[in-house]
Amino acid sequence: MNDAVITLNGLEKRFPGMDKPAVAPLDCTIHAGYVTGLVGPDGAGKTTLMRMLAGLLKPDSGSATVIGFDPIKNDGALHAVLGYMPQKFGLYEDLTVMENLNLYADLRSVTGEARKQTFARLLEFTSLGPFTGRLAGKLSGGMKQKLGLACTLVGEPKVLLLDEPGVGVDPISRRELWQMVHELAGEGMLILWSTSYLDEAEQCRDVLLMNEGELLYQGEPKALTQTMAGRSFLMTSPHEGNRKLLQRALKLPQVSDGMIQGKSVRLILKKEATPDDIRHADGMPEININETTPRFEDAFIDLLGGAGTSESPLGAILHTVEGTPGETVIEAKELTKKFGDFAATDHVNFAVKRGEIFGLLGPNGAGKSTTFKMMCGLLVPTSGQALVLGMDLKESSGKARQHLGYMAQKFSLYGNLTVEQNLRFFSGVYGLRGRAQNEKISRMSEAFGLKSIASHATDELPLGFKQRLALACSLMHEPDILFLDEPTSGVDPLTRREFWLHINSMVEKGVTVMVTTHFMDEAEYCDRIGLVYRGKLIASGTPDDLKAQSANDEQPDPTMEQAFIQLIHDWDKEHSNE
């Protein structure tokens, strides 16, 4: 076993104007030979800790040693043996894959035969060999992360710090990244992987769980998960849909957390609560409730004190959408988009009914985003039709867009404007003026908890507040249809739950939602899902339908992520001769 370690002794970091330290005095030891996960919600202190370990931030008190080096006093020696991949890794998008590798090799002084051998090993390791001449900007999200990892590994570091490398990456690419990182750890490298995705944390041998700068837990994820035995349940009702059932359950004092899981509601009960407490609670309909296997996420949420929010205030301020329940409001007919001879979307067909949440899933580069952009009028189809409320977006885009709300990936907010200025700008774009505009800004600010930060520059906001603001901006004109492009990418489970409470309350009002996501637990909130691969719609149905389609002897009860990977594997096998 490699004896490389990170040791923290009372390590603390404070920033001016903050009541609490970004990282409270922290004592722990991190070993090599396996992947250690750094887990916590937005603002927990994960990135601050990473930056101190990399020597990019000076601690206010305490000390850290990284394989024997002080990150500040011995920065030169440390940087020779440390690889750090930040959230926004510095790839040069106008350079090719090989040109990026050459640049990082120059920076690391890797030359001659050593460079040649290193590149050969990394290109094989990352499967990027066939793409050395491709511009980095033209790579899919998963391939960019692999290239970022390859560039970080050019100098053959002994310590690897990865800050949320799985954000925006599809399940197949994430699995490949994990296989690569586990292989490196097995060779004796010390690896610290920061994440807000708790399914990733479950793959770590050891985790550090932080919240508000404090270390709440260090140990095996499995050990923390086992503390939740007898407290995780799946609930259904023959008389009520899962969204309404979730709203009722979250108001009960016996419930610590709840979320939609396919056709069921997943509940975490407080320590002394029993299923009978839920069955006999006031206002609950007839239910079926059965114990299920706990997950690390259940333990994480419980350790943080539960989900906290039980109801979205949006339901009280949004109007009910007029229209016939069950009528088709979004439709793709033989939808095709070609770039030269390449068909990014190839004769795709689907229909979305009023008041439904429809999810588009697919690997990076599969055509999912192209399809989504055509459906909300951001791309013109080569052939076929994208219809919204019966209107062809190619012919009636202006009229159709009056009924659409769009929340872009990475939120598309104006960072140099304040929160209120963003709300004023977007409401103005949607035609609101004067008193009506002021009232809508006030109501949305109240609903999303933005009033106290109205004068803050948007660039300075934590990710969770940016997400709230982006959703508020997209709802200023109270659209009938809402398009969400990876709306919770990189946010923590608490923020994700709050977001979906808002979405569920809107759907109860008749709003139709179309969403793209790489986060498979999020797909469970969808009524139906379309899986796009190689430009084609290869599967569609409810989350439970897709899981049933992918079930086999090895995986009789697959997760949504396992179903995603299996359905693509099955399609590849079936079309291997084409």
UniProtKB/Swiss-Prot annotation:
Domain ABC transporter: 6-237, 330-559
Gene Ontology BP term (one): lithium ion transmembrane transport
Gene3D superfamilies to which the protein is assigned, alphabetical: P-loop containing nucleotide triphosphate hydrolases (3.40.50.300)
Recorded superkingdom: Bacteria
Binding site for ATP 1: G40, P41, D42, G43, A44, G45, K46, T47
PROSITE patterns: ABC_TRANSPORTER_1, ABC_TRANSPORTER_2
Family: Belongs to the ABC transporter superfamily.
Subunit structure: The complex is probably composed of two ATP-binding proteins (YbhF) and two transmembrane proteins (YbhR and YbhS).
Protein name: Probable multidrug ABC transporter ATP-binding protein YbhF
Organism: Escherichia coli (strain K12)
